[in-house]
Amino acid sequence: MPETCPNTVTKRRCAVVTGGNKGIGFEICKQLSSNGIMVVLTCRDVTKGHEAVEKLKNSNHENVVFHQLDVTDPIATMSSLADFIKTHFGKLDILVNNAGVAGFSVDADRFKAMISDIGEDSEELVKIYEKPEAQELMSETYELAEECLKINYNGVKSVTEVLIPLLQLSDSPRIVNVSSSTGSLKYVSNETALEILGDGDALTEERIDMVVNMLLKDFKENLIETNGWPSFGAAYTTSKACLNAYTRVLANKIPKFQVNCVCPGLVKTEMNYGIGNYTAEEGAEHVVRIALFPDDGPSGFFYDCSELSAF
């Protein structure tokens, strides 16, 4: 259930943040709120969502409310969210698509032991995902890959499509897709996928969907390495590369909008087992900066932290 709101349409700018109950998403909500924006914090778990809002309100962030959103459920919670925003705020100004999953499972106890052996303050820790012995503790399956693409790519598309009519009512609509540097084209090793995603002029949602379907087919048939996909993190890398491509398509499709994607950096979150170069607060700053670009700000770009980056 959503938080109680006044039954009046407000002129205050309104933002929706997916996956807002913890980590980067929570900090994005906090920082947008600090900038005077009315924030609708969303996540799948109702209890965790209410707890997150209560925590924010206890730290004097009153302009935050919760509404449940399951990005894999394109009918029930998305329609309810859209109705809620229309009733209470009349429009939507900012959409931050932050919800995401890693796409692999981890032998947590052994991985934490490896972190401990390296040392939590060691500069080598941020390179742990590159170590073969660490990758051996991580497992990728078709089911996990399917979930990863469903949340990180298809979920973003579904939420965005439902909320576009409300964004169109804004004087300065913005969409920020939280991506990753691993979604850069230089990490897309399947030749067909690279050809499709790298051709910005020919990009369409249908062509991006082709890449998603190719990857899932190869996962199901155990052909990931045979067909040249990344040997580790194929689902996550592809999901973020497809998200970046979708950002480009959307920016071209709706020139009135500011649509950008950003890698917040390797952030010390629960999903990363506390490994990273940035705190959640610092990672969120990279996202919020783009969400609050001036009205004549850029669109259709990829940012790595605060720097403009090639796709």
UniProtKB/Swiss-Prot annotation:
Binding positions (NADP(+)): 21-24, 44, 70-71, 98, 236, 240, 267-272
Reactions the enzyme catalyzes: (7S)-salutaridinol + NADP(+) = salutaridine + NADPH + H(+)
Keyword Transport attributed: no
Entry's Gene Ontology BP terms: morphine biosynthetic process
GO terms for cellular component: membrane
Entry-linked Pfam families: adh_short (PF00106), adh_short_C2 (PF13561)
pH dependency: Optimum pH is between 5.5 and 6.0.
Record entry for activity regulation: Strong substrate inhibition. Was thought to be due to mutually exclusive productive and non-productive modes of substrate binding in the active site. Alternatively, SALR may undergo significant conformational changes during catalytic turnover.
Substitution effect: I275V: No effect on substrate affinity
Protein role: Short-chain dehydrogenases/reductases involved in biosynthesis of morphinan-type benzylisoquinoline and opiate alkaloids natural products. Catalyzes specifically the stereospecific conversion of salutaridine to salutaridinol.
Name of the protein this chain belongs to: Salutaridine reductase
Organism in which the protein naturally occurs: Papaver somniferum (Opium poppy)
